[in-house]
Regions:
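Outer-membrane beta-barrel "beta-signal"
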Residues: 3-14, 181-193
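Detector for outer-membrane/organellar transmembrane beta-barrel domains
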Residues: 9-12, 16-137, 146
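C-terminal structured "cap/appendage" subdomains that terminate the fold
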Residues: 144-158
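Predominantly the C-terminal beta-signal and adjacent terminal strand-loop region
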Residues: 157-187, 192
Length: 193
């Protein structure tokens, strides 16, 4: 079982999402947003393999700033998160290719987006930039990794329908472990009812 707690403070308008589920943008519809939050997550036997398990704890600080610019000039969104990981991952688990390995160390990301004010066709463009950095402690997990992302969303119906076009460059992987340096272009679709 995973235990998670999050405490947030809304300095400006209140975010409308309940509890731990937040949005990375409100597309300007919630007015001026500036929220800072602290979270903790713990899972006994939450990392490793079926035979080499270890506990996992994470401490997080995140923020969201969103500002609809006056005179219908669009919406600026800035978001970030800093995480500290405490993972009891054994050397034997790290050597196993089936390991769901988490690392001791820290990581962060920052992003900035600008929602253009005018519709083009059925939607609005939202160009953005994002940077992700993973910093594992010690040599068991390898060196740090990072990723740059430059892209644009085409917002058709808020979070319910959008397209994404992006270019990424870096060596960060889903596990945080440094992978090969990759430069990639991708296209995504988000549709939800």
């Amino acid at each position: 079982m995973t235990y998670v707690a999050r405490i947030s403070y809304n300095f400006l308008n209140k975010e409308s999402n309940p509890g731990y589920y937040t949005s990375s943008t409100y597309f300007g519809k919630a007015g001026d947003i500036f929220t800072v939050a602290f979270a903790i997550q713990h899972q006994t036997d939450g990392t490793g393999t079926a035979t080499q398990q270890g506990d996992f704890t994470a401490y997080l600080v995140d923020y969201l700033f969103e500002k609809p610019l006056g005179n219908n000039l669009g919406v600026l969104t800035i978001e970030g998160e800093y995480k500290i990981f405490d993972a009891e991952t054994s050397a034997a688990a790290l050597a196993d290719p089936s390991c769901f390995c988490m690392f001791d160390g820290d990581a962060f990301f920052v992003s900035a987006a600008y929602l253009l004010p005018k519709k083009i066709g059925i939607g609005q463009f939202q160009p953005y930039v994002r940077y992700v950095k993973n910093n594992p402690d010690g040599s068991n997990f390898g060196r740090g990794s990072d990723l740059y992302e430059l892209g644009t969303n085409y917002i058709i119906s808020g979070h319910n329908a959008r397209l994404n076009f992006n270019y990424t460059s870096g060596d960060a992987s889903l596990t945080g472990r440094a992978g090969p340096d990759v430069n990639a272009f991708s296209i995504g679709v988000q549709f939800q009812l």
